[in-house]
UniProtKB/Swiss-Prot annotation:
This is Phosphate acyltransferase. Disulfide bonds: none annotated. The gene is plsX. Belongs to the PlsX family. Keywords: Cytoplasm, Lipid biosynthesis, Lipid metabolism, Phospholipid biosynthesis, Phospholipid metabolism, Transferase. Homodimer. Probably interacts with PlsY. The keyword Magnesium does not apply. The keyword Magnesium does not apply. It comes from Lactiplantibacillus plantarum (strain ATCC BAA-793 / NCIMB 8826 / WCFS1). Catalyzes the reversible formation of acyl-phosphate (acyl-PO(4)) from acyl-[acyl-carrier-protein] (acyl-ACP). This enzyme utilizes acyl-ACP as fatty acyl donor, but not acyl-CoA.
């Protein structure tokens, strides 16, 4: 059985949306047990059926106003901290929360812990590809865990993203690209130029060079690596642009009188299809990849369908052994580096 620890109190619509999503997922996935961490009385009042759902009382809640690291260190009986601790103690295979993003990241780093050899875990998300019959989505990493990144971090994101694309999206020989301000090999600042060289020399990944943000949704790569500041800005830009453009088109159609309104009715299904295609919550939450177990941050406004998608995502991560695969890669890398150091120099 797969066991998932869940912060029942995190998110704009918690605990109702979380509980509703968990109950729907429980009915879909017979091999999964759910550990709900939160205020027992509140959860019990909302829960309709406790089959394969365990409630663990958490007296404290980390709010959106709490300073993340301080809250994780001080609120030991909060739902986020207790869920993360369950993973560390082997009581659960993974945990997720729609609550305070910084606290989820801090709990992942300080409690669940990094895989040996990984400098900084990063947040990975899946985004849609439009107007490309051969590709429907791509992975982008980092989208906000680390505002600043070293070349080594970007190189490791290429490896982590490759594992994610292969095992979660069934991408064969996923193309890895570095987000930059031009496609030429010599583009970018010192960090990006150094990262380009590292990625070019990395075994086990299919590095295809630099990519510009304007081409991301066209399917130019399966994995796009970037620092967390840029990745988060690009993600929000995509969200905002898609929302604004759809609104502009709808206004243009509906503001042209009766004929426009009739045309709008005919186009309604098309609008809904576009909205659905651009909704990346269908892929679940953002994964803090590089930890010893799956830790997923879902959007604060997540409702039951997104909770179900996140649980589906976690089940796939556990069943496809992404974390053990990543750990083995970096263990072998460190072993090879040590072996090269231990080789005695030849006598002249």
């Amino acid at each position: 059985m797969i066991k998932i620890a869940i912060d029942a109190m995190g998110g704009d619509y918690a605990p109702n949306a979380v509980i509703e999503g968990v109950e729907q997922a429980r009915d879909l996935f017979e091999d999964t047990v759910f550990l709900l961490y939160g205020q027992r009385d509140v959860i019990n009042a909302q829960l309709k059926n406790r089959d394969r759902i365990q409630i663990i009382n958490a007296d404290e809640v980390i709010t959106m106003e709490d300073e993340p690291v301080r809250a994780v260190r001080r609120k030991k009986h909060s739902s986020i901290v207790m869920a993360a601790q369950a993973v560390k103690d082997g009581q659960a295979d993974a945990f997720f929360s729609a609550g305070n993003s910084g606290a989820v990241l801090a709990a992942g780093l300080f409690i669940v812990g990094r895989i040996k050899g990984i400098d900084r875990p990063g947040l990975v998300t899946v985004l849609p590809v439009v107007r490309n019959a051969n590709q429907s989505n791509f992975v982008m990493m980092d989208i906000g865990a680390n505002a600043d990144s070293k070349p080594l971090n970007l190189q490791q994101y290429g490896v982590l993203g490759t594992y994610y694309a292969e095992r979660m999206m069934q991408a064969k020989h996923p193309r890895v690209a570095l987000l930059n301000n031009g496609t030429e090999d010599d583009k970018g600042n010192k960090v990006h130029k150094a990262a380009f060289e590292l990625l070019s020399q990395t075994d086990g990944i299919n590095f295809v060079g630099n990519v510009e943000s304007r081409d991301l949704l066209n399917g130019v790569a399966d994995v796009v690596v970037t620092d967390g500041f840029t990745g988060n800005a690009v993600l929000k830009s995509i969200e905002g642009t898609a929302r604004s453009m759809l609104g502009l088109v709808k206004d243009a159609v509906y503001n042209t009188g009766i004929s426009g309104k009739l045309g709008g009715l005919l186009l309604k299904n098309g609008f809904n299809e576009i909205r659905s295609q651009m909704d990346y919550s269908q892929y679940g939450g953002a994964v803090l990849l590089g930890l010893k177990a799956p830790v997923v941050k879902t959007h604060g406004s997540s409702k039951a369908p997104t909770i179900v998608n996140t649980i589906r995502q976690i089940r796939q991560m556990v069943s496809t052994d992404i974390v053990p695969g990543v750990a083995e890669y970096f263990a072998n890398q460190q072993a090879n580096q040590q072996a090269s150091v231990d080789i005695p120099a030849e006598n002249d």
